[in-house]
């Protein structure tokens, strides 16, 4: 192999985002490395959320590469040491990574439903979500989505859930009530 230069690098692991690896490092890696694992940003987001929720640690994305890479390997019943490093992350980035992680895990999701424009419909939808143990964290009520706005309004509901199965349960209950929910991009 040889050292190659990438035209660009885009990753949330900015501490390791280099177009060209160092010339001194390459011969060492060539001699001692068995394999290279690439880690997508989505896996780093999940690893970050795991560290915050389960270990109460803030580790910057580059420092989590080993943890995220381990999830791609069969390491069950093996003794593994994963080196964690760095806490150099600003709160805006941290907030964004946490939100993306919650969305990936279906802990937060947004649905859009079209409702008749009459009193009681919002309460009906909120009751269905509450009965399914979902927690409404944001509502957007838009009367101007339909050409025939006197008859229909769009309601976008951002919901907190316990994960993928719970999200599916909530969506199924909305569907069973005839609401035809559509999953849309979370906008918090």
Go through the PLM ranges and name each one.
Residues 1-31, 71-116, 126:
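Glycine-rich phosphate/pyrophosphate-binding loop at beta-loop-alpha junctions
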Residues 12, 53, 61, 107-109, ...:
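A generic structural signal for well-ordered coil/turn residues at beta-strand boundaries
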Residues 12, 20, 40-44, 63-65, ...:
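Glycine-rich beta-alpha junction loops
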Residues 14, 18, 36-37, 56-59, ...:
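Glycine- and other small-residue-rich loops at beta-strand/loop junctions that grip anionic moieties
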Residues 20, 52-55, 74, 88, ...:
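Alpha-helix capping/termination and helix-coil
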Residues 22-78:
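Active-site-adjacent helical/loop segments in soluble small-molecule enzymes
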Residues 91-188:
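A conserved regulatory-domain signal marking ACT and ACT-like small-molecule sensing domains
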